[in-house]
Amino acid sequence: MRTLLSDRLAPITSSIGYLNVPLDTAAAGLLAWRRGLYGRVHARPVEGPLPRLIHHLEPLTGGSRSRELLVATRSPEWTAFFDCLLTGTDADTAVGQLCLSLGCKGVSLATVPHTLGTGLEPQGRYGAVQMTLYGPLRTDWLNRVRSISVAHDGSRWRFDADGTEQDFETPSAYTRRKIRDRFTSDMLAEYCAALGIEPFEEAFYGPAGVLVTSDVPTAPEGKVLRLTEAQAWFGIRPGANEQVPG
């Protein structure tokens, strides 16, 4: 399956958010939201290729996110979002809230290879390919417009699709016999491309970014790990995604 940089920066990049506004607008919105919650918030510009930008988020922290990263893309109307959560970026919370406050559209996605039981990784991970579209207005489910997901829930594969079907979708795929084939990483890339997003292309991201740091205390028993330590903790092996379907 396809992931950004073959999971070299996972778990940070296992989930990614996108806001349909330029970088400076996204940064102003994130700062305003965080200041309303935590008071003391700082922002500074950062620059470089995506791996260098992502490393500004270290160390990763369990239970709290004091560092968030906004990254310009080569589609000027889209800004990418990442954070320092140990378990991976919480794109849904940030994108959902900022779409409301900024009055824009947004996307969150997740791509996790299903390596459990394959021997490709020590512990193995439950796989998922997920995409959620957000809007500026409230819907029956927060401000989610559309959500499509194939994920292993620990006992079986599940396919779910909720909200308003979009013109760029391939609904005939949703009845395929194998559940994990109903929404694949290739399909996710095609859907994102229809919106002007190239999720798996390193060159799509940067070089400009904004690092936002909030005065959030680390959770009492939350782990604090460097990226390589987090990968060892979760048993993530970059490149394993290339050997599994999805």
Mark where each language-model region is.
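Long, compositionally biased intrinsically disordered terminal regions
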Residues: 128-246
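Short amphipathic beta-strand starts and helix->beta connectors
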Residues: 1-6, 62-68, 105, 220
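Short, intrinsically disordered low-complexity segments
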Residues: 38-93, 107, 117-143
